[in-house]
Design a protein with these regions (language model features):
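Gly/Pro/Ser/Thr-rich low-complexity, intrinsically disordered segments predominantly at protein N-termini
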Residues: 1-158
Length: 158
């Protein structure tokens, strides 16, 4: 499956396989990438927290067999996989909304990540500055810039 996803990437499609269904979007814009880079630069561990290992736009294979490419995935330790999809479950994910793909980023992705056991899901819309922070126990709305504490012991600014 990963080979097919990488073939799609080679022709300019960002393809994911979620719950047995293919989802695609065009490659991200400069605005999107600037937001991802800014957020990644802000990720840091709180005292005694996890090491906050974070990667951008890398395939993660989830427990149900789905393949997704979170804009940012935050792990509690270094993943073992270097040349294939990561199978370690992220502690948290951040998705930055792409214009034209709001439904995927605001409705499909958060529900999916939480169903797979991700503890914190953050969705940022760089056009409206809306920040949604979703956890198994609730959802919280913020306006960027905002500093968020994650369950794993990391802090980030969105």
């Amino acid at each position: 499956m990963l080979d097919k996803l990488l073939e799609a990437d080679a022709i300019g499609l960002r393809l994911e396989w979620v719950g047995g269904l293919p989802l695609w979007e065009a490659h991200p814009t400069y605005r999107h990438q600037k937001a991802v880079d800014r957020i990644r630069q802000s990720i840091r561990p709180k005292e005694g927290g996890c090491p906050c290992v974070h990667v951008a736009d890398v395939y993660v294979r989830f427990p149900d067999g789905s393949y997704k490419r979170p804009d940012i995935a935050i792990f509690g330790r270094e993943p073992e996989e270097l040349d294939e999809a990561i199978t370690l479950l992220p502690e948290a994910v951040v998705e930055v909304v792409n214009r034209g793909y709001k439904a995927k980023d605001l409705e499909i992705a958060p529900r999916f990540y939480l169903s797979q056991g991700v503890k914190d899901v953050v969705v940022f819309d760089p056009y409206t500055l809306l920040v949604l922070h979703l956890r198994p126990d609730g959802a919280f709305r913020h306006v960027s810039p905002v500093e968020l504490d994650l369950a794993c012991g990391c802090t980030l600014t969105v």
